[in-house]
Amino acid sequence: MEKIKLGVICGGMSTENEVSVVSASYVLSNLNKEKYEIYPVYIDKNGQWWEILDEFKPRKFGEEITKKEKIKNEFKYLKNLDVIFPVLHGLYGEDGTIQGLFELLQIPYVGCHVLASSVGMDKVYAKVVFEKAGINQTKSVYVRKYNDKYVYIDEHFNEEILSDIDVAKKVQTRIDFPMFVKPSNSGSSVGVKKAENERELVEAINYAAQFDKKVLIEQGIIGREVECAVLGNEDVIASSVGEIKAADEFYSYDAKYNNQESRTEIPANLPKDIIEEIRKQAVKAFKAIDGSGLSRVDFFVENGTNKIYLNEINTLPGFTSISMYPKLFEQAGIKYEDLLDKLIELAL
């Protein structure tokens, strides 16, 4: 049987370049070499494309790709492929940008298409879609950086230009402390800070605005962080539910990738009806953005009430050894290698 020419793309120009490389190293190590002719590609932080010549082995976080060859004509290189697995996280890889390129070149690819990727990446507009779908979410406020000030945007999208201090005061009229402040277009908790008072809120808004001009401020929920993986196109299945036991105050970038004390619990120790509702809401969120292939959907379960709040959807979740997406399906009996086969099959 003729092998499928599979491109695996990693790296990218986002702040999640290193995470993407680690994810891709595990994908490359687990692909069936009898089934696929593999073309591994690295995009560096400047946007240059390289063919990876290193051996396929799991990499540590921050480990550089040493053997690579510059790709002179990216379009010609891509047109040679049967299907692409973009193991890219963050801007220019998970936001519909590269998916649009694949669409123009008419090459099948793993994962969500342009619209779903774009909406899933933009936390502000994802909230608009999820609200329309009737999915419970935390209260939130959206502001936009404008020169040395901010545009405060109310629930009807009316705008008002204010200083950072005045924006912080305005935010407090709509939501209470603690708050979580995050860039609208960012992943892996990059740029996220918790604010317990007005001073911390001002600092957090200015910090998040370094990563994206759109900043989302959310009401903090005292509860548990849980995640559910989904797989499919029209016929979508949901995994079991896993819980994040973060070493830090919340599941920050450092807690995800550097702090060994962070751990996961699969399946989460929750009542059966809560687990089933989370699985149902995960599929609903995926379909609300017109998702395809895969996503990981993150929720909070409030202490005391067990009320479920959708946190966000991740249309191209991590594939490292500690990543929840493959671990959730492994618990359901789908091995890593078989999961990759299924994702590629869905793309084709």
Where are these regions (language model features)?
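ATP-binding N-terminal substructure of ATP-dependent carboxylate-amine bond-forming enzymes
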Residues: 1-115, 119-125, 144-162, 166
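Active-site nucleotide/adenylate-binding loops and adjacent lid/helix of ATP-dependent enzymes
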Residues: 2-10, 14, 22, 78, ...
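Hydrophobic beta-strand scaffold residues
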Residues: 38, 108-109, 137, 179, ...
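Glycine-rich beta-alpha junction loops
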Residues: 45-47, 145-147, 185-187, 221-224, ...
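Glycine-rich phosphate/pyrophosphate-binding beta-alpha loops
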Residues: 90, 189, 244-247, 314-328
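Phosphate-binding site of ATP-dependent enzymes
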Residues: 193-280, 304-309
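Conserved metal-phosphate-binding beta-hairpin within the catalytic cores
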Residues: 219, 228-230, 286-319, 329
